[in-house]
Amino acid sequence: MKRPVLIGITGGTGSGKSTVAKEIYNKFDEACIAMIEQDSYYKDQSSMPFEERCKKNYDHPDAFDNELLIDHLKNLIDLNVIEKPIYDFEAHNRKEETIKVKPRDIIIVEGILVLQDPRVRELLDIKIYVDTDADVRIIRRLLRDINERGRTVDSVINQYLTVVRPMHMQFIEPSKRYADIIIPEGGHNRVAVDMMVANIKHLLQE
């Protein structure tokens, strides 16, 4: 097995980056592709009271354990198995369990700040930024956090205005300049997804 092809997929919250990642993932046999979500690498906060965890800024680069993420990506590149963390969004903390991830021909790395850290960028073979209008993104975030993460409408809106939007403008949007490909319209852009799949297949054949 040769070195895996690493694909970084980023974009603002609710941009459709997870949809793009899943669309690409589903185009390949499960035996040859793996998914690494940056959300799984939020720092362990076991020593922090729950009330404090609720107030933390989770859209800032410091919220992520990039040291562990980079170590895991390098291990996958070296064809080693890793134990990927599992993050509990309701408890705002890592679970004790992990998920075993085996090295595959294709590794997708997906998250809001995947292109922000130069150490992560240099490991990626393809860098994708999913670009979607802000009003669409906030509606998607609202629906997701209420339905999947046990949040209230007021808490989601307050977090968006005080944290999510400022962090998007400061860290996520500027990382667009590092992308090899910018995909508009999120996961609904079938042409872009099909082009990416063709490009990945070409890289695998080289």
Curated annotation (Swiss-Prot):
Residues that span the membrane, as ranges: none
Any one GO cellular component localisation term in the record: cytoplasm
Subcellular localization: Cytoplasm
Superkingdom assignment: Bacteria
Catalytic activity: uridine + ATP = UMP + ADP + H(+); cytidine + ATP = CMP + ADP + H(+)
Gene3D superfamilies xref list: P-loop containing nucleotide triphosphate hydrolases
Keyword line: ATP-binding, Cytoplasm, Kinase, Nucleotide-binding, Transferase
InterPro entries: P-loop_NTPase, PRK/URK, Uridine_kinase, Uridine_kinase-like
EC class: transferase
Annotated positions binding ATP: G11, G12, T13, G14, S15, G16, K17, S18
Keyword Transferase carried by entry: yes
EC number, UniProt record: 2.7.1.48
Alphabetical list of NCBIfam families matching this protein: PRK05480.1, udk
Protein name as catalogued: Uridine kinase
Native organism taxonomy: Bacteria, Bacillati, Bacillota, Clostridia, Eubacteriales
